[in-house]
Amino acid sequence: MRICNLLNRNRIKHWITQIFALALLVAATSAQDGQPPVAAPVRPPLPPLPAPMALPKPGPTNDAPYVPQPILPGGVVVPLYPPGSPLLKMERIREAEQYNMSQAVPGRISSIVNIHNPSIEVHTVDGGLNTGAAIILAAGGGHNTLNVGGESADFVPFFYNYGVNTIILRNRLRRDGYSPKIDAVNDALQAIRLVRAYAREWRIDPNKIGIMGFSAGAELSSPAAILFDEFDRTNSAPADPLSGVSSRPDFVGIIYPGPTPFVRGASPPIPRNAPPAFITCAGAGDRVHAIWANEYFAAMLQAGIPNVEMHIYGNGRHPGDTLSDGSRMTSGLTDRNAIPFGTWQYRFIDWFRDLGFLQKPGIETKASKEITAFLSQPPPGSGRGGGGNRGATNSQANPVGAAPKAATPANP
């Protein structure tokens, strides 16, 4: 018995010694292999995020700023601007949005008007499917309404299947007294900053955030590709919680667009770090919009901006146009009576995958690498090669986004 007790005590001492030695080994290995942990970047405080669906329903004027309801269940709605922002019309901030409901699908919101507290509605991808990419959707509607059904809500499940997070933008409209070129474009750029600021919370890669606009919504996504520096300089007050967060989109989608900044030969400066663009439109059947699409493409091509791709389809019309059988051309994801124009979204996915946006979060994209390589080349007019890059200008922003100024995404 005494021998057994002695053996047991010796075994316990041996196990304790082994555990202690292993702990020392792990600590020593970690100290040798890694650098001391780097402190997380400090940013101004952001307001807490609301819970999904914990929002008031549309109703009469309130005694507080109106907050819109989600278009789809589970969406997190976040106002773009803090209360009291000088960019808001405070005398109208309490007015409720007006939702036009679908006649075919009960409970579906087809379009929205009376937007005075612009917002984003965030739909994230769960688990290992999440690529960290995020697409902000700017619906069309001629600046008189916001067609969030076909040109926003329908894309949430589509992009989810590819691991892409979807953000629905509710921007201010001309019919409600706002300027599309100023207020609506500001809303788009502010949305990019807001998503980038909350990248960690939403498990979004801050280097994979872009905007896709449809028709009038493309009048937001196309200028966002060249005006981000100006917006960031204008909105850099120390009291702004988003000050220092870049509004540069990492990519833009320009879908059957309205007039772009290059309409009728206009030549505004193009930053040399302008983002990649995917452009699509019907051709002769939507001639004016196709010309606007081509003007953007030609300007970026002449400036030498990498990875600008355009698809013009021979058969098709603009959404809402009357067809020969009396029906109307549909928008968004619909197959458009099975014509090739009805599959443009798969060409976008091909382009998106090729540029590396469907990789896991934290991996540098091909798009980012090629922009960096482009920036290393001599700018036009430097006398060191290059040339033909009309309008391309040096940009003071980070070459490929604002990762150093935003939180690193958490692992999904």
Q: What is each stretch, according to the model?
A:
Residues 44, 50-130:
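N-terminal cap/lid segment of alpha/beta-hydrolase-fold proteins
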Residues 124, 148-167, 297-298:
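Short amphipathic alpha-helix adjacent to the substrate-entry channel of hydrolases
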Residues 131-140:
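Short beta-strand element of the alpha/beta-hydrolase
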Residues 147-148, 154-155, 169-203, 337-340:
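Catalytic nucleophile-loop/oxyanion-hole region of alpha/beta-hydrolase
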Residues 286-295:
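Conserved alpha/beta-hydrolase "acid-adjacent" motif
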Residues 301-412:
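C-terminal catalytic histidine-bearing segment of alpha/beta-hydrolase fold enzymes
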